[in-house]
Structures are given as structure tokens and as C-alpha cells.
């Protein structure tokens, strides 16, 4: 069940990210491994089982990234970035929390056009782009309460299993984190 959102600028407990090859170290449900490791479009994969999947925007703003995001993107902690947090919903239930972080947010950045994305899933755009590069996944497990702009009832008890990778167009990165909500698995 959703609750009103609260704003976070930093996580209370930043997750510890590990390379996806170490997935056996996560205490994650076995059926989730394919989802965490699949490099194809998550949107397309979800739509196989949930054709009516939709997007609920939680936040879309210009703000400072999390410490781990700034380190991953090799940018100063004080640098503001474009951040979009959404739920991917199936039958009215949130199943994935997705967080997009784009540094160097200006008109010369090829990602700048995403400001008009609205309620469309990011995956519909990403996987249509030619010459797009993607870094290997990193994975983690953390409680739902630790993700910015994510509020669920009992979020202190709800675990998420997440993956992140960077998409690169030219010299411009886009960091995408996708957290699978345990209670919806």
C-alpha cells in the first residue's frame, strides 16, 4: 500500500553494491536472479506478464545525487543532477522502484530530451537508441525505506533487491537503478 511521499536527499543506510557475478552472496529469492541479471529491457520483460504495466512518477527534479551515485558517476557530491524516481506498477501495485540519475543536465546532453518522458517507461526509449553502451550490473539488497522518495507501508520491513548500471551516449552517462520490491515478487 502506498503512503504519501517524503523527500530524501541522502539514504539513511546507503546500500553496499557488489558485482552481479557475486549474486550468490545476496539472500535473494532464486526466481529473482534472472530479473537482476537480464540486460534486456525490464519494461518489455514486465509487460509479458503484465501488459497493462504503467508508470507512477514519485519525483522528477534537479537535486544532488546520493553519495554512492556521485562516486559511481565520478562527479562531485555537490553537483546537482536530474533525478527521476518512479514505480513500475502492475494492477495498481508497485513492483519495481526505478531511479534515473543524469549529470551534466543541459541542452547539449543527449539525455536532455528525457525531460518530456512523462509517464512513459524509460525502457521504451533506451532500447531504441543506436550505439548505446551499458556497463555491467552491480547488485544489492536493502530495505525499501532506504530509497529516496519511496514510501510503502511497513517499508522498514520490506526488502528490495536492486541492480544498477550506467547507459552511455557519447560521453554522457545515465545511471539507472531498479529495485524489485520483495512483497510484490
Curated annotation (Swiss-Prot):
Pathway listed: Cofactor biosynthesis; ubiquinone biosynthesis
Keywords: Cytoplasm, Lyase, Pyruvate, Ubiquinone biosynthesis
Catalytic activity reported: chorismate = 4-hydroxybenzoate + pyruvate
One term of GO molecular function: chorismate lyase activity
Main location: cytoplasm
Chain sites annotated for binding substrate: 84, 122, 178
A cellular-component GO term for this protein: cytosol
Protein name: Probable chorismate pyruvate-lyase
Signal peptide (residue range): none
Pfam families registered for this protein in UniProt: Chor_lyase
Top-level taxonomy: Bacteria, Pseudomonadati, Pseudomonadota, Gammaproteobacteria, Thiotrichales
Protein's UniProt keywords contain Kinase: no
Domain of life of the organism encoding this protein: Bacteria
Subcellular location(s) per record: Cytoplasm
EC number(s) from the headed UniProt entry: 4.1.3.40
GO BP: any one term: ubiquinone biosynthetic process
Physiological role: Removes the pyruvyl group from chorismate, with concomitant aromatization of the ring, to provide 4-hydroxybenzoate (4HB) for the ubiquinone pathway.
Family: Belongs to the UbiC family.
Amino acid at each position: 500500500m502506498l503512503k504519501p511521499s517524503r523527500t530524501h536527499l541522502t539514504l539513511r543506510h546507503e546500500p553496499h553494491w557488489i558485482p552481479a557475478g557475486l549474486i550468490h552472496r545476496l539472500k535473494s529469492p532464486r526466481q529473482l536472479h534472472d530479473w537482476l541479471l537480464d540486460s534486456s529491457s525490464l519494461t518489455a520483460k514486465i509487460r509479458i506478464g503484465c501488459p497493462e504495466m504503467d508508470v507512477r512518477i514519485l519525483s522528477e527534479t534537479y537535486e544532488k545525487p546520493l553519495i554512492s551515485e556521485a562516486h559511481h558517476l565520478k562527479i562531485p557530491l555537490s553537483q546537482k543532477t536530474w533525478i527521476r524516481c518512479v514505480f513500475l506498477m502492475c494492477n495498481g501495485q508497485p513492483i519495481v522502484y526505478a531511479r534515473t540519475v543524469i549529470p551534466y543536465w543541459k541542452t547539449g546532453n543527449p539525455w536532455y530530451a528525457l525531460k518530456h518522458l512523462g509517464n512513459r517507461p524509460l525502457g521504451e526509449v533506451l532500447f531504441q537508441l543506436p550505439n548505446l553502451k551499458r556497463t555491467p550490473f552491480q547488485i544489492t539488497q536493502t530495505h525499501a525505506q532506504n530509497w529516496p522518495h519511496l514510501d510503502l507501508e511497513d517499508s522498514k520491513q520490506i526488502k528490495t533487491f536492486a541492480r544498477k548500471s550506467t547507459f552511455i551516449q557519447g560521453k554522457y552517462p545515465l545511471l539507472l537503478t531498479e529495485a524489485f520490491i520483495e512483497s510484490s515478487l
